[in-house]
Amino acid sequence: MAKKERKFYLVQEDLLPEAILKTVLAKELLLRGDAATVNEAVEKVDLSRSAFYKYKDGVFPFHQWSPGVTVTLAMVLEHRSGILSKVLGILAAARANILTINQNVPVHGLASVTVTFETAGLEGDLDNITKRIRELDGVREVNPVGHSLV
């Protein structure tokens, strides 16, 4: 069965369900260190743990895609020669300014890789870029895991 392609949407905050908004707040508490545990964070925002875990990996605050914004892609690649090079080629063709590349030691023939890049000068949208990477032979997963102002 083919894996369903992920799509991303921009949605006004006031249109989002309360559980999604509270999930973002709980994640921010954890990132800032204002909550030491998930339990503490969800209690502070009055959210169930099950709702937090349901949404935590799929909702992120959005910042305008503009110069000075970085994006991080987390990937799982097969441990074969040239796969990471092809991924970097797609990013280079899109004029992404790569800041960091981190690759873990392969385990069971798979390596976790994160690539962080600036969006200034980026040609094409992130959905198209991740789709092109996802279609490469040897790429098992591609997920945008964050973006931030630098």
UniProtKB/Swiss-Prot annotation:
Signal peptide (UniProt feature, chain positions): none
InterPro entries attached to this UniProt entry: ACT-like_dom_sf, ACT_dom, UPF0735_ACT_dom-cont
Superkingdom of origin: Bacteria
Pfam family, one: ACT_4
Residue intervals of the ACT domain: 72-147
Protein family (similarity comment): Belongs to the UPF0735 family.
HAMAP family membership: UPF0735
Protein name: UPF0735 ACT domain-containing protein PTH_1602
